[in-house]
Amino acid sequence: MADPEERLARDLIEAFRSGRVADRDSLQELKLRLCKEYSLDSVPPNSLVLSYAEGDVREAMLPLLVKKPSRTASGVAAVAVMTSPHDCPHGRCAFCPGGAANGSAQSYTGKEPAARRAARNGFDPWRQVADRVRQLEEIGHRTDKIDLIIMGGTFTSRDPEYQEWFVKRCFDALNGEDSETLGEAQALNERARRRCVGMTVETRPDVFTPEQIDRAMRMGATRVELGVQILDDAILAGVERGHGTEEVRRCTRDCRERGLKVCYHIMPGLPGSSPGHDLECFRLLFDDPAYRPDMLKFYTLLVVEGTKVYDMWRAGEYAPYDEDTAVALLADMKALVPEYVRIQRVQRDIPATEIAAGITKSNIRQMVAARMAAEGRPCRCIRCREAGRAEDAPDAGSAELRDLVYESCGGTEHFLSFESGDRVIGYARLRLDSGPAATIRELKVFGRPASIGADDGDWQHRGFGRRLVAEAERLALESGRRRVRVTSGVGVREYYRSLGYYDDLPYMAKDLRSPVEGHVVPAGPAPPDLPAQGLVRLHVGLRDRRPDGREGRVEVALAHPVRVRVLAVGGEPRLPADGGQVRADVPVGGGRHSLEVHAVERHAPGVDPQDAEPGGRVGLPDEDHLVEPPRPQ
């Protein structure tokens, strides 16, 4: 006979099948009643019920049973792993706990959930990943798409061999098998059951040089978290930070130019500052284009034993912000955040038992949100507007494509987003700077994670991502760029290949070609329904040779319109009634190619018109035959 817990689980599943349980409240009510009926001393977790549910029933019950749905509300499952205890190269900041002497990674107390998990697994990356994935699956989360976060102070200052070994072992754990090299592990992960769609490294601005950035990206990094703390050189020197704002500006620019997403850690309440000064420095983050991060984490200073700030506090030389002061300041800061920024965190994950002074409550984000709501001040950050977190589901049919343009670090950023009402369904970050290529630094579609290749997510796999990429390509071509590169997670490479991109590691790339100015020979009368001027689509196929040597016909986006005179469309003669010019969209693709022009005679500059026969092929041997698209008037 089944034990009481199994009977309870199967009764709940049957109640769901029959429709007697339809939401979380009714499920919890029935669960408590069954606990009493079966004389259980404690209430079994939802993970127990999930362990007995199978197939379609399990999938249908997930929204009711999943614990902490916010863990995957953004469309991916975050897996944080921590490096072994190691000190920062410059020493210790006045506020910083942890380090090798403390048996924890620098800047961590060792009591945070991720730190405890790391210690429990001997700081072994494979075991940490496997442990966290198992935890997520037990509480009902999908783990097809993993956002890998490498924590532990200053990862990029570690020995390069350790860095590569650590990352490889993370990929091995996701793949479920060992590889000889990191490259082999990455290649396996491109088609693995659990794919790494993004990878984050934590570091300092002064030890993330161009060489270190390139190494991190070769390992798979798509985002960096920089300990910025405050934009005040005197205060940074006072807390023995070891760098100033110049390093922050330099590092931010280097990261953006290479296509990384940039997250700043901001620490209100440092010695020597005040709420007013903190707010002034925070305002500078977005007023000055040398900064303007993509993401933020707020870490209001907490006094922890074993730090210099702790000694200052004991001596009466320093007092941290109290709860009311911190909540008011964070509300003021959140109200300033632009729509292209995502606030990742609002407080540290340090247990209250480890905090000697400062904020000890764990729901500061909710307290800040409540204060802003009471004051009628909305937060416009991405996280607060994500479709995956909204109780009122947006209407996909009413989604609008928006383009928020701003300058940052010597380049132009396009924050492209599909929004319905006040909700963000998905977005892309496109950067145009002095480099020859446009860079898609991020592509994101929100909602419950869809299984890879399936159409079972809230918003994923519904075409929003493809449309965002197409718009980014259009803007790139319009700006005169002939190439787009994407900062792609290892596990997303297959997706970009399906869009015509090729491997240009650490990027995925597509070569855009500007349309060719062409001419045709009029022949035959024009049908009466063809306008004298208008948009005509030519029947053009593309045979593509990519830099990686592969060939084949591909589907490509439409290029900027060019002027041609039409000889025939679809085999039927069609000419402008006045014999003048019309506009036509011409598909373009990547690499060296030839256009197979059907029923249209045209030639590129430098090609003899007699060599361009109707229905024939017009060769484009080099880029000299390409012209820049006309710029908007």
Protein language model features and the residues they cover:
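Radical SAM enzyme [4Fe-4S]-AdoMet core and its adjacent flexible, acidic
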Residues: T300-V341, R348-E391, W459
